UniProtKB/Swiss-Prot annotation:
Subunit structure: Homotetramer.
Annotated function: Involved in the biosynthesis of ADP-glucose, a building block required for the elongation reactions to produce glycogen. Catalyzes the reaction between ATP and alpha-D-glucose 1-phosphate (G1P) to produce pyrophosphate and ADP-Glc.
Protein name: Glucose-1-phosphate adenylyltransferase
Organism the protein comes from: Dechloromonas aromatica (strain RCB)
Superkingdom to which the source organism belongs: Bacteria
Amino acid sequence: MPMSTSCPHQPYCEMREQTDMRFISHLTRNTFAIILAGGRGTRLKQLTDFRSKPAVPFAGKFRILDFTLSNCVNSGIRKIGVATQYKAHSLIRHIQRGWSFLDGRFDEFIQLLPAQQQIDETQWYQGTADAVYQNLHFLRRYQPDHILVVAGDHIYKMDYGRMLAHHVKHHADMTVACIDVPLDEAREFGVMGVDEQDRVIDFVEKPQNPPAIPGQPDRALASMGIYIFNTKFLFEQLERDAMTKGSNRDFGKDIIPYIVPRYRVFAHRFADSCVGSDNHRPYWRDVGTIDAYWEANMEMTKVTPELNVYDRDWPIWTYQEQIPPAKFVFDDEDRRGTAVDSLIAGGCIISGASVKRSLLFSSVNVHSWASVEDSVVLPDVDIGRHAVLKRCVIDKHCRIPEGMVIGVDPEEDRKRFHVSPKGITLVTAEMLGQGAAEGR
């Protein structure tokens, strides 16, 4: 069995200071984050026809990627590479506009790493591991002590510094963040088994019959797609995998199953590093389907949602367009501009219309006598007079005609729009015959 690579911070590991903020800041300053943001997001249907999944808007103001980027910055990790591939234009534009505040004079940066056939002129990124492998030349330039590899398409708040401290404390070669999920959902994840010290002893990617957690027959321990590696160890494993015939070039399918029986791989419980979930189960959402996306957005309309985006101690950073405040006009008995249990972004005008339990992103106009309920309306949408929207997701730039009713009759909606298994209606400008997908 190969020897485990030595931990460069072993002297620190003997100290009780391993969890204090000074120790963690030392670790985070010398950590490089690679965010994998090239996913197609095909289960989001037409919502990702012109954008990648990490670029999809969320919670009235943000993009999905903003949560991972904010976790990095708030954790003190400010050397960040974002690997992009599919339909990357809107994501790149968003990062350039909203994430230019890091200061290169202090070696802080966000570097875009588009797929560019770096290794082979006939191949783009072939898998999650290959996306990192093709950028080894870039990582070697900085020689970090640790590398954080993280997916950019989930919604959660996490202090990666705590996970780093856990990694160093256990002299790990690799650490995998994990969360317990219902057994019937575990087929969509990498599932692991651990011993009493949380050392990973088994790992299988997306199993048809996932193993349950001992003593919890209805739960499984799932990988969150968040990994910490000792840098030298990661380089060695990526180079080995690149030479392995038949590899999928994927962390979950190839890298982790290979190293688990040979090296020190530990699980890190998300509950130990999640932020702002004191009164709830740790909040983590994969919004990979229309139903999951709609449900996660609807949770934000609750009086006290599980995800706190108002926390000034752990802000979610994003691009802030220069637009005026939201406006509500008319106060007649049958024509009153109101919004209840809703998130209304800047630039919106609610003109004698009713909005309930909904999220309106920036610059949405809702005209008189229109009704919007239980819906997610993305930016720059115009909703005509007397229109009715219920349980909808409306993509950017849609113009809902006067009197149109959506979300009331599923059979009628299916003739023009996409209706999800749980009855959520997705509407895009193309479905309405309104053409181009500019500025998604």
